[in-house]
Amino acid sequence: MATPAVSGLSRQVRCFSTSVVRPFAKLVRPPVQVYGIEGRYATALYSAASKQNKLEQVEKELLRVAQILKEPKVAAPVLNPYVKRSIKVKSLNDITAKERFSPLTTNLINLLAENGRLSNTQGVVSAFSTMMSAHRGEVPCTVTSASPLEEATLSELKTVLKSFLSQGQVLKLEAKTDPSILGGMIVRIGEKYVDMSVKTKIQKLSRAMRETA
């Protein structure tokens, strides 16, 4: 039998599967909408955590949950569809008790187990992280270069990219390397995408030469 707390979170999740306006209005809407099953669970959790002022705590706990579920000894029985649900719940209860997770995180895990959605856990964690990133005003930016950028170049690039942000927004920069682009860089910031790689320039030159042949 589901606990009252689990049932409450379950009701919030279900209301996102319907078009009933009144229950939807009672939820605290996240700053960004994430679609799909994972998005519905994450939105319900965001609403509950926001009302209790525990967004940061839940975010930290969810990252720990994702880490735990990557451990083979845990993932094998918990994510195996042929293992009885009661065994999964017992294993999860042991984990949540050991980690001393908050009731919000514990209830989410129990709800996912109850609904046979444990395989969606990583997706829920990712969706919640996306909401929290938007909550903090973070703008994700990925810079891909053929080789690691020098600190001076990276610092100058950050200054340029920050000039495109609105007030209150925070740049969250991730630098990656991909030798296949040959040189230059590829920048993705928010919804914008700029390809300044040597590889793309060569491809454009090749197409142009074929068209004029």
From Swiss-Prot:
<dbReference type="GO" id="GO:0005743">
    <property type="term" value="C:mitochondrial inner membrane"/>
</dbReference>
<feature type="modified residue" description="N6-acetyllysine">
    <location>
        <position position="60"/>
    </location>
</feature>
<comment type="function">
    <text>Subunit OSCP, of the mitochondrial membrane ATP synthase complex (F(1)F(0) ATP synthase or Complex V) that produces ATP from ADP in the presence of a proton gradient across the membrane which is generated by electron transport complexes of the respiratory chain. ATP synthase complex consist of a soluble F(1) head domain - the catalytic core - and a membrane F(1) domain - the membrane proton channel. These two domains are linked by a central stalk rotating inside the F(1) region and a stationary peripheral stalk.</text>
</comment>
<feature type="modified residue" description="N6-succinyllysine; alternate">
    <location>
        <position position="162"/>
    </location>
</feature>
<keyword id="KW-0472">Membrane</keyword>
<feature type="modified residue" description="N6-acetyllysine; alternate">
    <location>
        <position position="162"/>
    </location>
</feature>
<feature type="short sequence motif" description="SIFI-degron">
    <location>
        <begin position="5"/>
        <end position="23"/>
    </location>
</feature>
<keyword id="KW-0007">Acetylation</keyword>
<dbReference type="Pfam" id="PF00213">
    <property type="entry name" value="OSCP"/>
</dbReference>
<feature type="modified residue" description="N6-acetyllysine">
    <location>
        <position position="73"/>
    </location>
</feature>
<protein>
    <recommendedName>
        <fullName>ATP synthase peripheral stalk subunit OSCP, mitochondrial</fullName>
    </recommendedName>
</protein>
<feature type="modified residue" description="N6-acetyllysine">
    <location>
        <position position="172"/>
    </location>
</feature>
<feature type="modified residue" description="N6-acetyllysine">
    <location>
        <position position="54"/>
    </location>
</feature>
<comment type="similarity">
    <text>Belongs to the ATPase delta chain family.</text>
</comment>
<dbReference type="GO" id="GO:0046933">
    <property type="term" value="F:proton-transporting ATP synthase activity, rotational mechanism"/>
</dbReference>
<dbReference type="InterPro" id="IPR020781">
    <property type="entry name" value="ATPase_OSCP/d_CS"/>
</dbReference>
<keyword id="KW-0496">Mitochondrion</keyword>
<keyword id="KW-0813">Transport</keyword>
<feature type="modified residue" description="N6-acetyllysine; alternate">
    <location>
        <position position="158"/>
    </location>
</feature>
<comment type="subunit">
    <text>Component of the ATP synthase complex composed at least of ATP5F1A/subunit alpha, ATP5F1B/subunit beta, ATP5MC1/subunit c (homooctomer), MT-ATP6/subunit a, MT-ATP8/subunit 8, ATP5ME/subunit e, ATP5MF/subunit f, ATP5MG/subunit g, ATP5MK/subunit k, ATP5MJ/subunit j, ATP5F1C/subunit gamma, ATP5F1D/subunit delta, ATP5F1E/subunit epsilon, ATP5PF/subunit F6, ATP5PB/subunit b, ATP5PD/subunit d, ATP5PO/subunit OSCP.</text>
</comment>
<keyword id="KW-0809">Transit peptide</keyword>
<keyword id="KW-0066">ATP synthesis</keyword>
<feature type="modified residue" description="N6-succinyllysine">
    <location>
        <position position="199"/>
    </location>
</feature>
<feature type="transit peptide" description="Mitochondrion">
    <location>
        <begin position="1"/>
        <end position="23"/>
    </location>
</feature>
<keyword id="KW-0375">Hydrogen ion transport</keyword>
<feature type="modified residue" description="N6-succinyllysine; alternate">
    <location>
        <position position="158"/>
    </location>
</feature>
<keyword id="KW-0406">Ion transport</keyword>
<keyword id="KW-0832">Ubl conjugation</keyword>
<feature type="modified residue" description="N6-acetyllysine">
    <location>
        <position position="192"/>
    </location>
</feature>
<dbReference type="InterPro" id="IPR000711">
    <property type="entry name" value="ATPase_OSCP/dsu"/>
</dbReference>
<feature type="modified residue" description="N6-acetyllysine">
    <location>
        <position position="176"/>
    </location>
</feature>
<keyword id="KW-0999">Mitochondrion inner membrane</keyword>
<feature type="modified residue" description="N6-succinyllysine">
    <location>
        <position position="90"/>
    </location>
</feature>
<dbReference type="InterPro" id="IPR026015">
    <property type="entry name" value="ATP_synth_OSCP/delta_N_sf"/>
</dbReference>
<feature type="modified residue" description="N6-acetyllysine">
    <location>
        <position position="70"/>
    </location>
</feature>
<dbReference type="GO" id="GO:0045259">
    <property type="term" value="C:proton-transporting ATP synthase complex"/>
</dbReference>
